[in-house]
């Protein structure tokens, strides 16, 4: 039973809830999100529903298993994503390693943690001339755009971009693609360069 109904109506609940819903659009794009909404209303219009009902509609409309995504609703605390990068000039490969955790989470928050989250992590790579570089992940036939949403699902995961012509500067968590705290060792010069050139507002 619920002890205090006010727990459901705090600013944290509203703000986190809206960010979780926005992540569906980040994962599936506007068209995929619209398909999920259409299916949700077709199934549940006029009914009392749950967050699981909404998640199932998004999953079914887009043909994707979102069981891991449920942890956003049940795990307390703000995730931290630490980022490490390395560039191999000879191979023209740029690796990005992401690690997720909760840092100094309270004991109560740690008790709710069931495993890694599905984190949509948007990234771009900026060349020395300040322009976005085309992005192609290892195994892909061709580059696809200049911003890529990485499906970050493990405690630690490495993504490799290929055909990267120069040492880039990463533009991380573009469009605030998920409500996480990013940890990356930017220098002051790096931050000034991003301020001057990053296409992500």
Task: Annotate the PLM regions.
Residues 12, 17-20, 31-32, 42-201:
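Non-catalytic accessory/interaction domains
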Residues 35-36:
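Surface-exposed patches in mature extracellular/periplasmic domains of secreted proteins
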């Amino acid at each position: 039973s619920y002890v205090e109904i006010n727990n459901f109506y705090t600013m944290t609940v509203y703000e986190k809830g809206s960010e979780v819903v926005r992540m569906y659009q980040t994962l599936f794009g506007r068209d995929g999100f619209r398909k999920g909404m259409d299916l949700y209303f077709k199934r549940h219009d006029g009914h009392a529903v749950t967050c699981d009902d909404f998640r199932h509609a998004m999953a079914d409309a887009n043909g994707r298993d979102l069981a891991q995504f449920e942890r956003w609703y049940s795990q307390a605390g703000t995730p931290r994503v630490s980022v490490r990068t390395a560039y191999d000039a000879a191979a023209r490969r740029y690796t990005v390693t992401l690690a997720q955790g909760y840092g100094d989470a309270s004991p109560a928050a740690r008790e709710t943690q069931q495993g890694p989250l599905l984190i949509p992590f948007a990234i771009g790579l900026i060349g020395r001339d300040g322009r976005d570089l085309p992005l192609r992940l290892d195994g892909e036939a061709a580059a696809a755009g200049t911003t890529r949403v990485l499906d970050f699902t493990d405690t630690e995961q490495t993504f490799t971009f290929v055909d990267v012509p120069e040492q880039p500067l990463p533009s991380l968590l573009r469009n605030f693609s998920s409500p996480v705290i990013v940890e990356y060792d930017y220098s002051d010069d790096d931050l000034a360069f991003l301020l001057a050139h990053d296409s992500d507002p």
